[in-house]
Amino acid sequence: MTLLEKQYVLGGLGTAGLVTIYLPLCDGVGHQVSFGLAEELLRLSISMGAEDEYPANWLDSTDPAGRTEKDHRFRVRYNPWLFAILAEQELVKAGVKILYGCYAVDAEVREDRIHSVIVESISGRQRICTRTVVDATGDACIAHLAGAPTETSQQGNILAAWYYSQGSEGYRLNMLGFSDVPAEEDAGRTARPLLDRRFGGLGCGEVSEMMQYSHASTLNDIRKKRRSDPSWVPTAIATMPQLRMTRRIQGEYTLDEGEMHKYFADSVGMVSDWRKRGPIYEVPFSTLYSAKVKNLIMAGRCTSVTDAMWDIMRVIPCCAVTGQAAGTAAALTEDFSAMDIRQLQQTLKNSGVILHERELNIGKL
């Protein structure tokens, strides 16, 4: 297995992008819904210590009385660099070949299959022959290059400029601009956007402008903070654009926000709504692929969902759920349109994944 990583650390927006909140594995009313790799990665992210948020009611206790709708959800804050290195070590142990600074620029498609992916790196341009391809680019780049049907974000992305700092208040994460804050914590916030403009995120010139605006916003905030605290210094800024939604595949099924608590026979796991308490969604396997490119499967924030559902599915737990399903499927078949769904589901269950809400024995909420 070969992993192409455009950056020089693993983790994408969750590490290089400094969006270091591992959003909830639970539904917010006492029930864990995401398991398997989603939980493994959460625990790995804080295995050398959590930052700011630590859900003791989930990690240090099994008492359901401490997991009500009034209690802390199963989410954490982690150190991005520790998480990236720990993840790298896990991949190395698993025998994965990691190619840093390497990204796809084209795909050779023959008879509805990706025969090879053309990549560029410090080594120049190379061809990697493929049996199966998992597109976890976040921008559906492989799908786009291979000619699979895709959709782009209609609402665009608000400017963000998250950065870490050290000052008289200590070490902290400053969440400037777009923020992954649940509705219950967002009440009363009146801060204006950093810029009255949205970004699609799929053009080099536009993304470069976005990064410059982000850098300027960071510098302006530092100057403002230094008026009252001369010791205030930045300790880390994002080294990639803090884009949330850009492009996604049009799969065999498109999941919508209104399909909470709905049973799907081909479910490969469950996710919650990080923004509010209550909803549970089963994730259909048919949202991960298009039959037009039979050996391509999606993982992360570019699966087949409506615009309304996209904001739910773009976060780390959902990326882990779809990533585990996609990777497992890629090990079992070379044609995702002909996937033996029972074999896939059993393999996922053997790895600790719970597939259906009814298996939680909680009924409808």
Model-derived regions, located:
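N-terminal FAD cofactor-binding segment of flavoenzymes
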Residues: L4-A56
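A structural motif corresponding to the C-terminal end of an alpha-helix
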Residues: E90-K97
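N-terminal capping segment at the start of a domain
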Residues: S45, G49-A50, W58-K70
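Short gly/ser-rich anion-binding loops that grip negatively charged ligand groups
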Residues: D27, H31, R73-P80
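Flavin (FAD/FMN)-binding glycine-rich loop and adjacent Rossmann-like elements that form
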Residues: G14, L37, L41, A56-L59, ...
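Short beta-strand element of Class I
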Residues: M1
